[in-house]
Amino acid sequence: MNRDSIPWSGTTSVGSAGEVVIRGPGEYPLADQRVELEVFMGSSIAKEELENNLFTTYVEQKLGIHFKFMTASANTADETEKLLFASGDYPPVILNGNLTPDEQVRYGQRGMLRPLNGLIDRYGDRIKEIFRQKPDLQKALTASDGNIYALPSINECLHCWYAQKLWINTSWLNKLDLDMPKTTDELYRVLLAFKQGDPNGNGLQDEIPLSGAMNAWHTEITGFLMSAFIYNTDTNYFYMDNGVVGMSAEQPQWRDGLAYIHKLFSEGLIDPAVFTQSLDGLIEKAIRKDNVLGSLTIGHIRMAFDSLNGNMQQEYETVPPLVGPAGYRAAGYFSSSESAPFAITDKATDTEAAVAIRLADFLFTEEATVRNEWGPEDKWWRTGRSGEIDEHGLPAKYWLNPDFATSLTQNDLWGQMGLLYRDRNLRESWAVTDDPHSVSGYEHRLYQETLKNYVNKEPSEVYPDYIFMDGEAAEEAGRLRAPINDYIRTNMVQFIMGVKDTKTDWDDYVDGLRELKLGRYLEIHQKAYNAFK
């Protein structure tokens, strides 16, 4: 059906916004006439494909709306969004953006974002149901002024919460008669054996014992390795000590971790390109037919293997968090998204705002979530059948076609763009296979690897990923954050590569960190944490 041919039936007026009558909860179309919504979408597909996308058409026809898309590529979406707000040329609705808590407060208090509280109370039945189920979520989304300015996409993903993983080539371990490393010393010996023992059997010393990449999902080696010395998520570098916010990167344990990683690097056990290569560079090494990669830090192993080389990933298993020389170990824990994709701006009319919040409410339903991620029923997925069991051994609610993972064209879904509500009940209700290394068994494999090695190994207290500050504090923290984090990352690489020495240059490094007003930065975050708690 043409996306402009929207069927209409019946009206039940529960109130009006302008001249358009907005229907009650659960009634579709949403209004007594079609409403056009101009929305910003950071999109992994072209605008033309998005307009003709089957899920787009499904939402438009179901809700009686017409999308007018303002798009940016996934790589430029963050920058584009910031430029739109800076210029004032933003649309009425941000549907797939990346609004951080600081930006939500800044734009909200400047009047650029509409508070959503009243709209949710009036039109957001599904949102209110979710808030009742998860009161901590509503608390986390509420800014210090009491307003909710944006909504996140909810994806309760166990392996994502513990995505800071090291994957190791177990066929190499078996060939060299090595055990899975559990300590930093054991990892050193394993990597040394990978370098010297010719585990790929080609007679050349071409093995790369450990690699990673920059600017991809948990591919930086320092996140996993440093957490054998002090907590490090490679994001804000905070650790918690009895309610006190501290900076890992100024502690003696950080220095010890840098010295350890430098040892690995100086002995050729770490890929020399690890601080410069992109994910594409890591993939090129992972899929080489002569099998040169011993281990890699990456959120999930299929990120490194394309569909043509998917069988190679079967050789890799996760390494548990390593125990360091002082007996410390920690799994990185990422409890939630650090940003929110959905907001309504001051450019929206009352009609558009009412329709937009009902759009958000619908996208949070299971019906919309399943179709958003997996497309129409009976193509890529169907309901479960007798004998199919889920992650917990219960009758499966859904079954996913194994061909979904290798399909190159999927213009019948949004693939998690926009809003969705994929809680653990939904994620873990899909049928699992007996073979965790098969395409259809991959989600089950990630679940089991995470459960085996990482769950409950995080510190008892971690700094929240999603936290609000008041307007002035958010502005100040934003100004301090970039130079502090850039300084930490630059010096981290210099210490690891041997440009700086942890014995002779450490004190100067710490002094430089404090000159960037680290004390004030921690003070701001401490105040925000106290308010959050």
Predicted regions and their residues:
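Helix-loop-helix "hinge/cap" segment bordering the ligand-binding cleft or interdomain interface
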Residues: 117, 144-220, 237-288, 342-378, ...
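Extracytoplasmic/periplasmic substrate-binding proteins
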Residues: 105-106, 215-237, 262-426
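Loop/turn elements at helix/coil->beta-strand transitions in domains of secreted/extracellular proteins
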Residues: 34-37, 63-66, 88-93, 112-114, ...
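Short alpha-helical segments and helix-capping/turn motifs at coil-helix boundaries
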Residues: 21-25, 76-83, 99-102, 134-137, ...
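Conserved small-residue motifs centered on glycine
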Residues: 8-10, 15-24, 42, 366-490, ...
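Generic, well-ordered alpha-helical scaffold segments in large soluble proteins
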Residues: 58, 62, 80, 84, ...
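Conserved N-terminal structural module of periplasmic/extracytoplasmic solute-binding proteins
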Residues: 1-186, 236, 245-247, 351, ...
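Short beta-strand segments
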Residues: 39-41, 212, 297
